[in-house]
């Protein structure tokens, strides 16, 4: 195992190079300095080498021991402050990848460019893209702690994982053999004052329904778009009843097939990530000649249905169509099968938790649907706090796929995180929160997936709590981070470290 420790330097280049054109003056200054620097480089899931190297450079220039894994995970060790050498180590953890979402008119290449941050002093957001506060604000807070020699703290093991957003690949790959801490503070939660102590397990299901694109000459082509949906995180927002572009497009096509026999599917593209509720879907169909006007009228009528049904959850939903070239399309017979399968597939909340009122127990998100030369690809994110329910939902997907002549590949199966009734670590954190704010912290479980479950499997006896500053509408272009909440959260983390000595 390769470790590196380089000569210390009082001001790391990562910190010196920060321009701070946007976030300068926001407190805590060092946290937002690191956050702005991290946001200046691309770091979408699967594209984490640059941001991983930034973390390595930081450790090198502070003279801290570190390890960088082939997958780009980074572990950094900081010795205890004077007088705390005998205290148990604490693991501080966050992930360095983000969900890259952008508006339809955004020209930014998020695989090559950083984000354009904006702030009004109370909130931070990114212009026309997601912010990636989930979870770079955690990384920024941890880097600030590692760089601050005035803090009182036990030995710190900082763990930065990759590709959490696409199946927790970094947590799966993480080598924990040299981690000594038995207390984990995960900073990947999004409600201040809420302390997560349990989470759902999950898995991904990738479905392929084979289909061939053949000549569609002599037919009328139309493009169809469902847009204006709010989208959101499939763990945090699935219970809100927001429309899924993929699901709604399936309903549009199913209804159209009843009115326009012979309709053929020519294109389908909805969603980018299986764990994000699809906010826009584009499709194209080939119709028998002479059907155009009737089809346009049908689309206008169906838009009214959607606007009525989703007036509260998605008030800006639109359904439009326009003439389009459709040189090739799936056969009419196979189109029927594909659309039937699409509408039969489960989506949304399946069951609510009986122990935590208001918490989703089991759900499935039809996150991505694409038609290509191989057929119709459907990617699902399945979540449940009960392992058997998770597997039963996966069985339903396999059953529908099999009836349509398709196949399913399953991946990214991760365990849930079971609630610990007694936890001194949790009690210390809650006491610190009460002393700092005068409020009682809220202890809850989440339907979202967290890396804590995987790390607890890898490190026997590990105790964990997840918390974080106020983040709204993560994974979407409306994502925003509260500045005052970040300051309070950082103060709480520092106080927890002090009390852990």
Region locations from a protein language model:
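Acidic/His- and Gly-rich active-site-bordering loop/insert found
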Residues: 17-123
């Amino acid at each position: 195992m390769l470790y590196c420790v380089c000569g210390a330097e009082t001001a790391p280049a990562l910190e010196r190079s920060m321009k701070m054109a946007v976030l300068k003056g926001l407190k805590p200054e060092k946290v937002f300095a690191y956050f702005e620097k991290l946001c200046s480089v691309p770091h979408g899931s699967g594209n984490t080498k640059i941001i991983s190297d930034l973390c390595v450079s930081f450790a090198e220039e502070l003279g801290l021991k570190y390890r960088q894994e082939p997958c780009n995970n980074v572990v950094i060790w900081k010795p205890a402050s004077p007088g705390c050498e005998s205290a148990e180590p604490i693991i501080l953890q966050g992930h360095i990848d983000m969900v890259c979402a952008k508006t339809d008119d955004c020209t930014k290449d998020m695989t090559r460019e950083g984000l354009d941050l904006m702030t009004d002093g109370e909130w931070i957001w990114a212009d026309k893209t997601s912010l990636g506060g989930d979870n770079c604000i955690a990384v920024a807070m941890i880097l600030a702690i590692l760089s601050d020699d005035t803090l009182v703290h036990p030995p710190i093991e900082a763990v930065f994982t990759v590709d959490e957003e696409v199946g927790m690949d970094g947590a799966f790959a993480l080598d924990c053999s040299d981690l000594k801490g038995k207390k984990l503070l995960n900073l990947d939660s999004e409600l201040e004052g809420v302390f997560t102590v349990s989470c759902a397990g999950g898995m991904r299901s990738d479905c392929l329904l084979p289909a061939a694109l053949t000549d569609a000459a002599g037919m009328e082509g139309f493009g169809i778009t469902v847009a204006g949906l709010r989208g959101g995180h499939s763990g945090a927002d699935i219970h809100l009843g927001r429309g899924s572009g993929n699901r709604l497009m399936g309903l549009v096509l199913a209804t159209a097939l009843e009115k326009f026999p012979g309709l053929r599917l020519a294109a389908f593209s909805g969603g980018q990530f299986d764990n994000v509720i699809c906010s826009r879907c584009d499709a194209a169909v080939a119709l028998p000649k002479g059907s155009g006007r009737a089809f346009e009228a049908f689309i206008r009528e169906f838009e009214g249905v959607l606007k009525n049904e989703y007036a509260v959850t998605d008030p800006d939903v639109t359904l439009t169509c326009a003439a389009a070239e459709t040189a090739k399309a799936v056969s009419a017979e196979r189109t029927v099968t594909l659309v039937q399968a699409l509408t039969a597939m489960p989506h949304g909340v399946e069951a609510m938790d009986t122990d935590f009122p208001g918490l989703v127990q089991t759900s499935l998100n039809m996150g991505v649907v694409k038609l290509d030369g191989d057929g119709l690809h459907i990617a699902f994110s399945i979540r449940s706090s009960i392992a058997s329910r998770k597997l039963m939902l996966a069985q339903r997907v396999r059953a529908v796929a099999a009836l349509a002549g398709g196949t399913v590949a399953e991946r990214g199966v991760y365990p849930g995180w079971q609630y610990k009734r007694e936890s001194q670590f949790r009690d210390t954190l809650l006491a610190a929160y009460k002393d700092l704010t005068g409020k009682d912290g809220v202890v809850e479980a989440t339907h979202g997936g967290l890396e804590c479950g995987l790390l607890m499997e890898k490190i026997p006896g590990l105790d964990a709590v997840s918390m974080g500053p106020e983040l709204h509408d993560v994974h979407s272009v409306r994502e925003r981070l509260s500045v005052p909440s970040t300051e309070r959260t950082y103060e709480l983390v520092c106080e927890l470290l002090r009390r852990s000595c």
